[in-house]
């Protein structure tokens, strides 16, 4: 696994970790819905191949792509970490894609075994969420400059 989420985790620990996180992989065809608004937001998705779009309808019913998520990236982590019970967005395959899903609740709560890899995984997730936060803050800054 090359995803940043698994950085500094020993290769031999990954199969055990994925089993404990109830990981499963699913293939989606282009334009197929991966998750619908209103579905439980208790997962973290990792795009193994292809890409996905995060879609949201505005007040007038217009559908907007709020994010395009490339391969080897995460989605759903902000909702899972924030404890938001249901997705406020649709997630659709932008092209044929394969997605691995991890149980967000299990990932965020360390097990009784106090596995080293679990602590590393949580630290890696925090780093990913922080980087996305900084990117979005920069985006807000640029967008606000456009309107000056």
Can you annotate each of these PLM segments?
Residues 1-30, 75, 79-84:
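Cyclic nucleotide-binding regulatory module and flanking cytosolic helices
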Residues 20-21, 39-41:
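Short, small/polar residue-rich loop motifs at catalytic or cofactor-binding pockets
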Residues 33-39:
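Short phosphate-coordinating micro-motif centered on Lys-Gly-acidic
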Residues 34, 66-67:
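Local beta-strand/beta-hairpin segments that build beta-sheet-rich folds
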Residues 42-55, 71-72:
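Glycine- and acidic-residue-biased ligand/ion/polar-headgroup-sensing regions
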Residues 67-127:
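Cyclic-nucleotide recognition modules
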Residues 116-146:
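Polybasic "coupling" helices that flank or enter modular domains
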């Amino acid at each position: 696994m090359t995803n940043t989420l698994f950085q500094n985790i020993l290769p031999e620990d990954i199969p055990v970790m994925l089993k404990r996180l109830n990981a499963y992989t699913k293939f989606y065809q282009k334009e197929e819905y991966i998750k619908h608004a209103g579905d439980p937001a208790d997962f973290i998705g990792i795009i193994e191949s292809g890409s996905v779009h995060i879609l949201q309808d505005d007040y007038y019913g217009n559908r907007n792509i709020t994010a395009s998520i490339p391969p080897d990236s995460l989605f759903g982590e902000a909702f899972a970490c924030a404890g938001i019970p249901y997705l406020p967005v649709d997630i659709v395959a932008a092209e044929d894609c394969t997605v691995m899903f991890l149980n967000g609740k299990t990932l965020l709560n360390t097990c009784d075994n106090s596995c080293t890899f679990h602590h590393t995984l949580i630290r890696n997730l925090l780093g990913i969420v922080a980087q996305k936060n900084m990117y979005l803050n920069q985006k807000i800054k640029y967008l606000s400059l456009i309107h000056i």
